[in-house]
């Protein structure tokens, strides 16, 4: 697998298996209590998997103690929130619009996150170990986003409201697709 290293991408490729049904049911309850959207919670839960971890003793064999991961569920959660402004605009205009591919044009949320990450990269240039990882910025910004169409307004509201989504206890910043995980 080759990708441009100069862009500082990070990719983990690990073996995975579908979640055990009992774990999946518990996870659905956890996600649904966190997201409060039954359909989205079900869809997200259906994408969760158990993954291996070479640092754990149970690595060589299938075990219910494997870590849970859900990158596809996270992408679905992000997309649902990214589309807030599109839905609001369509409702206000009562327009009939044909569906467009989701990622041809960046949404206000995507552009805001892009600017936040760029700011982070500039602020922590030369001090890479202290900068927030991208998933933290994306999660907090997505939570704080209220569907604004104007980029400046979206950034102002995101920056004002991000701190509301940082818990004083563990998990400090819950993973929306696995809320008990920090």
Predicted regions and their residues:
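Conserved catalytic core of two-metal-ion nucleotidyltransferases
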Residues: 1-69
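Conserved nucleotidyltransferase catalytic core and NTase-mimicking acidic/glycine-rich helix/loop elements
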Residues: 81, 89-182
């Amino acid at each position: 697998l080759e990708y441009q290293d100069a862009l500082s991408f990070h990719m983990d490729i690990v073996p995975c298996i579908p979640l055990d049904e009992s774990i999946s049911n518990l996870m659905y309850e956890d996600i649904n209590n966190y997201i409060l959207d039954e359909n989205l919670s079900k869809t997200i839960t259906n994408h969760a998997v158990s993954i291996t971890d070479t640092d754990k003793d149970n690595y060589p064999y299938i075990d219910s103690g494997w870590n849970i991961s859900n990158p596809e569920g996270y992408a679905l959660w992000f997309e649902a929130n990214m589309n807030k402004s599109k839905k609001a605009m369509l409702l206000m205009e009562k327009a009939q619009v044909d569906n467009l591919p989701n990622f041809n044009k960046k949404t206000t949320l995507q552009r805001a996150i892009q600017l936040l990450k760029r700011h982070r990269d500039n602020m922590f240039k030369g001090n890479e170990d202290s900068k927030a990882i991208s998933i933290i910025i994306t999660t907090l910004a997505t939570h704080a986003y209220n569907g604004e169409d104007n980029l400046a307004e979206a950034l102002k509201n995101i920056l004002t409201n991000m701190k509301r989504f940082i818990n004083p206890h563990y998990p400090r910043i819950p993973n929306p697709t696995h809320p008990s995980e920090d």
